[in-house]
Amino acid sequence: MGIRLLIGSLVLAQALTAGYPLIEIESPPDYHRLNDFTRTTISNALPDLKNLVLSDTIHIRYKIVSSQAGFRSAVGAGLPHWANAVTLFPQKLVVIQTPDLSRTTLRDYRTTVIHELVHLLQGQSVPLNLTPVWLNEGLAEFYAGEFDYSERVVLSRALFRRRLIPLNNLERVLTFSHPRAELAYAESAAAVEFLIDVYGTETIRAILRGMRDGSDFGKALEQTTGSEYADFQDHWRTYLAHKYNWIFLLDIQNILWLIIPGLAFLAFVSIRRRNKRTIRQWNDEETQAGMDEENN
């Protein structure tokens, strides 16, 4: 399998979006349909990612691997065990595991393809090592549709428990445990959501353009939003508190914990009332029986 993977099958497909170059996808010979699915996913996602592209010359290259040996050979060591895809620079290459290798659904695989595509496009506009990790991962989460109900609950629970991770500390996300990484990704996506909700859809492009023109991230952020980096983070935390503070209560587990005691109390009251009625009925019956005996 390792030899077959190295030989692979190289498929070149013209991107459907005007102005984009060829989409180059390498995959094992037995994964032609997954290759086509990957290409279609990329082509369909490109129009929604135009704000990340500042150059007319971009490269889109994916390498699909079906074995852990092939994955390690392509990406090297140092990734957490939960990582099933990575975008490599300066190679401008996405290495991604097949769904059967990563034990994920085709839907999850599609999400990962788009997540890494965001990294690939953003990194060709502004090197990813110049932008904060929360922006890199937040953009990928946001555009791949990963900032869903479950991530919002994770974020809300952390807010309630006062366990938010400062944005600056997210630089070490690859060293985090899976639960802590899950929170880090949710925070990153929420920060990008905040940027877009408050400052508009062109904000991301304006920040990237400012950095491409020579500003560092903090300066580009200030030029675009009018807020210094520290103030931006304060505003973001206020935004989170207003929008997500109590969402965790809608989590089904929390709902059950709230409902079950109430149901138990209602059951107790109902049983107690029923017992009182039964006792009263027995007393009435005994009283009536006593009156009947006296009359006889």
Show the residue positions of the predicted features.
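Hydrophobic secretory-pathway targeting helix
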Residues: 1-20
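Juxtacatalytic substrate-recognition/specificity segment
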Residues: 19-132, 217
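Short hydrophobic alpha-helical membrane-anchoring segments
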Residues: 13-17, 124, 266-270
